[in-house]
Amino acid sequence: MAIWIAVSADAYFAGVAAWGLTLLALAATGAGRFSTGASVAAGLLLGFSIYLDYGLVLMAIPAFAVLMVARNYYPLVGAIVGALAVVATFTGAGFWWFDGLSLLRHRYLSGIAMNRPFAYWSWANFASLICAIGLPAATALRRAFGTSALRSRRGFECIMIAFVVVLVVADVSALSKAETERIWLPFAVWLVAAPALLPRRSHRFCLGAQAVGALLINSLILTTW
């Protein structure tokens, strides 16, 4: 993941969205004026993020998961107010988000996407994703879908599941065919934490495996980055 974080603007987009989710989590677990301010700030950042990258509209899924885990939906009001303020600003300046999305979809599907069959990239996207997040993270994700984890609805597992759902939706949209190791970075960066679900004794091994994997990919595969 570090390969693409270091050289891609998507890492900046990921940072904006990540701070938005963080502030939303703080709002959901805080109280009083701090909670209100944090929720509005979260909405401002998450609202701004969808103008950086159309795909970041899918951050609504993990955002809802954050509120569900905290069992506090009141910050949603402040977040919506903040997000609408961003939308109003861009719309007032003459940019309508849905027109931009429609044009992007048309240009993408009539351009480079024509030479990238969905039948292949629907699964190859995830192969690229595994290269980005590393085998330890990909292996650990199955624990988030375990019976005990689903029954207990533990926070960490719920967030991991939310981001997996995001990636499935992004894949089915057919607007991400190839380059998902970069395009999906704002979502995939969260999955790098998945090895925390593995036994503690394996953590050092996972860290080493991630470092070796990154070096091998950057040395043996032409990533163009």
Stretches found by the model and what they are:
Residues 15-23, 57-70, 189:
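Hydrophobic transmembrane alpha-helices of multi-pass, membrane-embedded glycosylation machinery
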Residues 31-32, 72-77, 141-162, 201:
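Membrane-interface helix-loop-helix junctions at transmembrane boundaries of multi-pass membrane enzymes
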